[in-house]
Curated annotation (Swiss-Prot):
InterPro entries tied to this protein: DUF1846, DUF1846_C, DUF1846_N
Protein name: UPF0371 protein Clos_2302
UniProt lineage: Bacteria, Bacillati, Bacillota, Clostridia, Peptostreptococcales
Organism: Alkaliphilus oremlandii (strain OhILAs)
Domain of life according to the entry: Bacteria
Family: Belongs to the UPF0371 family.
Length: 502
């Protein structure tokens, strides 16, 4: 897909704007909403956007920046998972620290928010401290969010410890939403002013894009991505009243603004410089858009992708019916159909043909991949391998101009692996999944030059689209993500077996 977004222009504009904001204060607490790293949603809806743009931005400012990571104790206790990586929030925190350090960015500390002695959280705290990570514990703020007099007092923010920082910009981030970032920023403002320092707060959140129309697919795609949070985009009424200008924000920020403004005014002892929640933001992503039509089409595709994802989550019992229905309503707003995702029909047609040939009324999983040149490649499940493995092999064979009749992996390699699964490990389904087939292919490549040529084509799948007629296992989904393939699934299980890796 062609670029519709200028990454370099955006980085320049964004870093300049943040530095302008920090000039007004001794210290700026910058709340980072959304994903700090691996923001694949932004990459999909803004072709040309780098998924680690925020990290690259911080690297440009690294002499002035240190990072505080917030983790909500309840998320650790219930093993909340980051969907795009399939890892828990505590593990994602460790990964985030490693990634920040790899860019020479200073990680100040981890703040455990709303801690109440949860056992799993205590273990996590011990793990961090024994690895030399500074940990601060914040308990629930008394009076929050409505009793401003109690919140801004020694009984409220004063009860939580002050985080010692040294740089002029303190980035406050988290593995996911509702982790206590805002509360941590305000807690710090309270302590800074108690110490006689002038500190400020700003918010850096990519979506919704404030200077893009309300019903633009880019902003609608944000609603599709947050159906579980029930976020609704809206015109910022405070911004309209103050400046007679239309700016887009979302319901939670708009609803929280009056109280947030009062808290800041109580802390600082003077009228807030912010006239609206949009004023608090420093987001300049809208200025990086160079082709609106490309952005619109990419955003529509993301809305369809999110509908499939929500459908699968509903099937698994992870979201309620209201969330699924809301996802459907968003599709209807833009008059989108599932078949507008080009790769869907070839996969379904392949599955239908397999069912017709088998003459059985049961699921016949199939997959399709759309290559960068628009070619559709399909794959089906068999005794040797599942549909995910088959479609990957078929795709790289096509890219390497290898005939269908040539086997990339010798039975001498395949059979021992299948025997290991069925006999030694006693796994009922001995068909190889996509990870196993790639390992088998790499072994074959050591002695088979044709397999080596095919293996080298895997990188060409980065950015391709894929669709499965059955819900993928978590492992298969992760392999496709690692290969850079955007994959969706129909909300149907591959078998009637209840013990399914989902």
């Amino acid at each position: 897909m062609k670029a519709g977004f200028d990454h370099e222009k955006y980085l320049e504009e964004q870093s300049k704007y943040i530095l302008e904001r920090v000039n007004n204060y001794d210290k700026l607490y910058l709340e980072f909403g959304g994903k700090l790293l691996f923001d694949f949603h932004a990459k999909r809806v803004l072709p040309g956007f780098n998924e680690n743009a925020k990290l690259k931005l911080l690297y440009k400012l690294k002499e002035k920046v240190e990072v505080v990571i917030c983790v909500y104790a309840g998320d650790i206790e219930r093993n909340k998972i980051r969907g795009d990586f399939g890892i828990t929030y505590d593990m994602d925190t460790l990964r985030l620290i490693d990634d920040l350090r790899s860019y020479d960015l200073e990680v100040n500390s981890v703040v455990i928010t709303r801690y109440d002695g949860q056992p799993a959280t205590t273990v996590f705290i011990n793990k961090l401290e024994r690895r030399g990570i500074k940990v601060y514990i914040h308990r629930s703020t008394k009076g929050y969010p409505t009793d401003v007099d109690t919140i801004v007092s020694d009984e409220g923010y004063g009860q939580n410890p002050y985080i010692e920082t040294t740089k002029p910009i303190v980035v406050v981030t988290a593995p996911g939403p509702a982790s206590g970032k805002l509360s941590t920023c305000l807690n710090q403002l309270y302590h800074e002013y108690k110490r006689g320092r002038v500190a400020g707060y700003s918010k850096f959140e990519t979506f919704p894009v404030w200077n893009v129309p309300l019903k633009h697919p880019l902003n609608v795609a944000y609603e599709a991505a947050t159906v579980d949070l029930k976020d609704v985009n809206m015109i910022d009424p405070f911004h309209l009243e103050a400046y007679n200008e239309i700016a887009i924000n979302y319901n939670r920020d708009v609803e929280a603004f009056p109280v947030l403004k009062r808290i800041i005014e109580k802390i600082t002892g003077e009228e807030s410089v912010f006239k609206s929640p949009t004023d608090m933001g420093v987001n300049r992503v809208g200025f990086g858009i160079i082709d609106d039509e490309i952005i619109k089409e990419a955003s529509k595709q993301e809305i369809i992708r999110r509908y499939f994802k929500t459908g699968c989550e509903y099937k698994k019992g992870h979201v309620d019916k209201e969330t699924f229905e809301r996802s459907k309503m968003i599709m209807e707003q833009l008059d989108l159909k599932l078949e507008d995702r080009k790769v869907v029909l070839p996969a379904r047609e392949k599955s239908a043909k397999l069912r017709e040939v088998s003459n059985k009324n049961e699921a016949c999983p199939a997959m399709a991949i759309e290559l960068s040149d628009g070619t559709m490649i399909t794959g089906k499940g068999s005794h040797e391998m599942d549909a995910t493995a088959a479609v990957l092999l078929n795709a790289i064979k096509y890219l390497a101009n290898i005939s269908d009749g040539i086997h990339l992996i010798s039975p001498v390699v395949l059979e021992p692996i299948r025997n290991l699964k069925s006999k030694a490990l006693k796994i009922k389904n001995s068909a190889l999944d996509c990870e196993e087939i790639l390992i088998a292919l790499s072994i074959s490549a050591a002695t088979n030059p044709t397999a080596q040529v095919a293996l080298e084509k895997l990188s060409m799948l980065d950015g391709c689209q894929a669709h499965s007629t059955a819900i993928l296992s978590l492992n298969d989904e992760q392999i496709f993500n690692k290969l850079g393939i955007d994959v969706t699934s129909d909300p149907e299980y591959a078998t009637e077996n209840l013990y399914y890796n989902s």
